[in-house]
Amino acid sequence: MASALEQFVNSVRQLSSQGQMTQLCELINKSGELLAKNLSHLDTVLGALDVQEHSLGVLAVLFVKFSMPSIPDFETLFSQVQLFISTCNGEHIRYATDTFAGLCHQLTNALVERKQPLRGICVLRQAIDKMQMNANQLTSIHADLCQLSLLAKCFKPALAYLDVDMMDICKENGAYDAKPFLCYYYYGGMIYTGLKNFERALYFYEQAITTPAMAVSHIMLEAYKKYILVSLILHGKVQQLPKYTSQIVGRFIKPLSNAYHELAQVYSTNNPAELRNLVSKHNETFTRDNNMGLVKQCLSSLYKKNIQRLTKTFLTLSLQDMASRVQLSGAQEAEKYVLYMIEDGEIFASINQKDGMVCFHDNPEKYNNPAMLHNIDQEMLRCIDLDDRLKAMDQEITVNPQFVQKSMGSQDDDSGSKPSSYS
């Protein structure tokens, strides 16, 4: 091993044993070029360092190995990274979160390139757990995990990191930018859409769309298109975006989504035939955007919406008559829709198989059973917790030096603009 590398190993050992992590971070940041020049000796360096005791040194070496233009032995490197992430010292790597996250990004890109996304899901879950200060902290690795879960069509492992409400962002030594934030909410929305949890999907798309922005983001544009479709499926209309949404959305993103706005407009007429014609008209656009599956679900939801409207007019109705009124192909298709809607709790009805009549019923829920009371109790606890968090955030902002300085400056400007009362 070259003398410069020996010095690097000795410095890593010494600084690690002394607990001088800040100085160690400075060392590994300066040593990238040295390590890159000695690629053939890096496995020897890894052998001389202990993963648990010298986590930052091992991280620096693995990061450089993954940065190579071509990786000669990917399987060995993957095993080394897998072992490192599972056994490294979490307290140590939090001093170099930018490099640790960078290693995870490199791993993700390599697995995507090799079409092996499933292999990285468990590794990235461990990486997030090592890096997070708490379960409500968002890291840039979250977006990597969601990307691999989508590509592998393996959604459930990511749900543990999607079902929590994020309250904080890991700054990653200043390296965190908007892209992983947008990707987390966009990919998360796609995962929830795939699981047909449309309410949560809509929330995630909204977070991506309403991110403060000064320029058009392709991720925001794609999230906006899916937001329109999921809104129609869930609510039968496009939900109004919050007032704090960036002007970029109205000025640039909406004009780039004309086909989707046309779809929403035709959907509001409750005419399936017109909607089918519009889908045929913009078939190429919807297919290119990979949204044809959602568009078909919009058409299906319009049939359901029209069936729900019938429940407000009729007490009983034949399946054939229902099919005619909502423009379905026949009684058999109408029966299929009614059975699915009964199963999902979208309508309350029964079908008489003898005469093919559908009887509509009132909602049997009386809101007085123990399960319902438990749900209400849980919602109240969530509201109390949210109120406590808002108060804590408000207090944190109130004592923030930048906020105090800015608010005092505003007060000075206001007092300076007032006319003097003295003559």
From Swiss-Prot:
The keyword Nucleus applies. Keywords: Cytoplasm, Nucleus, Signalosome. Disulfide bonds: none annotated. It holds the Pfam family PCI. It is found in: Cytoplasm; Nucleus. PROSITE patterns: PCI (PS50250). It comes from the Eukaryota. Its main location: cytoplasm. Transmembrane segments: none annotated. GO terms for cellular component: COP9 signalosome; cytoplasm. Residues 403-423 are annotated as: Disordered. Residues 197-365 form the PCI domain. The keyword DNA repair does not apply. Component of the COP9 signalosome complex (CSN), a complex involved in various cellular and developmental processes. The CSN complex is an essential regulator of the ubiquitin (Ubl) conjugation pathway by mediating the deneddylation of the cullin subunits of E3 ligase complexes, leading to modify the Ubl ligase activity. Belongs to the CSN3 family. Component of the CSN complex, probably composed of cops1, cops2, cops3, cops4, cops5, cops6, cops7, cops8 and cops9. This is COP9 signalosome complex subunit 3. It comes from Xenopus tropicalis.
